[in-house]
Amino acid sequence: MEIYFDNSSTTKISEDVTNEVVFGMKNFYGNPSSLHNLGLKSEKKLKECRETLAKTINAKENEIYFNSGGSEGNNFVLKGILKSGSHFITTPFEHASILNIIKKLEANNVKVTFLKIDKDGKVDLEHLRESITKDTALVSIMHVNNEIGVIQDLEVIGAIVREKSSRAKFHVDAVQGYGKFPIDVNKMNIDFLTVSAHKFHGPKGVGFVYIKKPNTIIPLIEGGSQESGVRAGTQNIPGIMGMTLAAKISNTNIQENYKKVFGIKERFIEKLKSIENIKINSPLSEKFSPYILNVSFKGIKGEVLLHFLEEAEIYVSTGSACSSKEREKLGGSYVLKALDLSKDEIQGGIRFSFSDDNNEEEVDYVIDNLNKGLKFLRRKR
């Protein structure tokens, strides 16, 4: 029995989306930059996809730009906006594609402010208000944290950025939130938004970035005039078609999927009450996404427990797949460290992440194997 509880790393592409990608490969192989009929046919399909995606976030079609996914999108925004002498505001537990750029930014004379967070990982809004200055060029906040699932209040944060500065831009890494929670870029005062298709049952290697004013940013990839000169390179039409269908399905079913996944997390937490020496780092509350459950199993290294579960065909993670090597160097998750957890709690952290493909019955199988694993590993220790 295979149980896949690692949906924050990536999701299984749906059958309908797979068929759409194949259809795109067979029928839209013309280069959309070509002037002949096959090229024009592909160009028209790209326009349709832009229009569909724009509607999901209340944007305009000409504000959607295709790329390879979240990491490229985050690099594009930071490197395209932040110049020498400017000021950047973010949090201490953003995705690696944000945090790993910071040393280079600081070497280029960019001042960086890390916002204070509370015990749950929510941004200290007063600190944000105090931190915005006349030099602030960009505020970058992750919508839903990829390790513990804490949800930031984008509407409030966007309002503060607008109130305090007419110059500062607001960037949202929506990789873990898009398709799971409603997003309105106008209501939330968002200037840049990054999205990755493989987090909502779409294909890997494709995503999009919303840009309110494209003339305010320097391209990351230069070359041809694709994507209105914002991002060079021939567009991945089959991937974009698959992403668009996956986005349409996910956004149409936001409430239904939320309710289903909430039930899975609720059952999981209830069953965990029978297990001793644990700490739930992402409880069942409005502050946290039901799609992510992070638990510290004290006295056990998370990686060891992960491999024990793997033997039973249960697939989980110890945190972000994009930061696994950095986590080894640090001796645990930098996200859990930012929450001031003990060394034992950090090293014993496991992330269970769900999707609408999962069901409550799978929880019982996982709990049974967790009990077996913990008894064996703790006794062995």
Model-derived features: positions:
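Pyridoxal 5′-phosphate
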Residues: 1-381
